[in-house]
């Protein structure tokens, strides 16, 4: 049974990775990739991915649809909590003042945290509510494309 569970979880993780990269987010798997991506000029949205139900049912759909907006971040990236542990830990170092949370979204500008949408603002909400929250941040902090 353990072998079946591992195969199942590998499929869940693979699908979760594919969903977010298909939405245009660049996957960061190492601390070095995180540093390179999060210190770029401009605004960066980080989606902290996970395998929980609220990630698949709410956060990833919101990540996909929120960026179809007049104003949006310059860069879209993702780290995977529980999978790419070192990359996720490094990303969280940039989220100063916020506790670890997954799934979650962090909006940064020039490597500095602006705002986060934490798990408690995702879990139990409809995807549209999270999309609206993200687009509100884009409206406030991002440039029109």
UniProtKB/Swiss-Prot annotation:
Belongs to the bacilliredoxin family. InterPro entries: BrxB/BrxA (IPR009474). One of its GO terms (biological process) is cell redox homeostasis. This is Bacilliredoxin BLi02578/BL01507. It comes from the Bacteria.
